[in-house]
From Swiss-Prot:
The active site is at D174. This is Galactokinase. It catalyses: alpha-D-galactose + ATP = alpha-D-galactose 1-phosphate + ADP + H(+). The lineage of its organism: Bacteria, Pseudomonadati, Pseudomonadota, Gammaproteobacteria, Enterobacterales. Catalyzes the transfer of the gamma-phosphate of ATP to D-galactose to form alpha-D-galactose-1-phosphate (Gal-1-P). It is an enzyme of class 2 (transferase). GO terms for biological process: galactose metabolic process. The gene is galK. The record marks R28 as: Transition state stabilizer.
Amino acid sequence: MSLKEKTQSLFANAFGYPATHTIQAPGRVNLIGEHTDYNDGFVLPCAIDYQTVISCAPRDDRNVRVMAADYENQLDEFSLDAPIVAHENYQWANYVRGVVKHLQLRNNSFGGVDMVISGNVPQGAGLSSSASLEVAVGTVLQQLYHLPLDGAQIALNGQEAENQFVGCNCGIMDQLISALGKKNHALLIDCRSLGTKAVSMPKGVAVVIINSNFKRTLVGSEYNTRREQCETGARFFQQPALRDVTIEEFNAVAHELDPIVAKRVRHILTENARTVEAASALEQGDLKRMGELMAESHASMRDDFEITVPQIDTLVEIVKAVIGDKGGVRMTGGGFGGCIVALIPEELVPAVQQAVAEQYEAKTGIKETFYVCKPSQGAGQC
């Protein structure tokens, strides 16, 4: 049963009438451009064919009812006429409440809604299940009430909800690609202007995501430390963000910076340049160059930004040994575990899967999870 059929069926059973709309918003994987988003830089993600799906209908009052199919059909109810505060027991409900609350601040011309939510974006894997949920909820209200909001505004609303209501720091990339993704394309995003450019993906190339299943423990504290180090670097150059510093300016005075901060800054500057070049390489179908850029990105994350772990490095090495210069592989996401992403000719996928199955667990004691994805369409009706 598809997520659409599942949520529609549950909706009718729970609420006693049929849903009028079914909305989806996808998860994402970032092909290159890591930790550049909060430095006003460039990222190159694609939406993937794992998504949050919501069957929904407008109500003729001011109440919101939300059922979470993936959490034992837990039900949350709240009113649009009372202050929206955090739910004491259901963390999932706070993503929904946060999106609705921040949407009220932007455009309060919507009424009540019934929703049933289900999703298959792996949680805790760094594939943006939370952004997918935020964008899906925003799109539900936009579609049901014909709100004059575009994808970028729905994305910004989701980011605000996550930062201010849920209380998690995040950049804008995850919500933006979920809202604006394009089938068979990656999206080059300028995280300062929020300008986007669709970049066609070469035919016959699979987007493979492998979860190391190494439990990320440091990611929150270390993420905040990296942000502070980048801000320290920007202040040193008297610029609003590292986006505004050139590699030449950096090289001239790198010795004056704290050595750790210098390494962090170098990663951001080189990663920004790599990301812009990667978009060109992909567009030209130059998988060899894309692979080189992904390898440089991984080395920079490992050595300069210091956010990889041995398990992730091992996974990258196993994949690289199989694909050689026929594709690319690197860690993706915040770091300290999580996933790697690989662009692989479709005919090599079985060999990669076999090599990883034979070697990764033997070397690390952890079993990986392997996903073969298609670059997919952003949020909308399904």
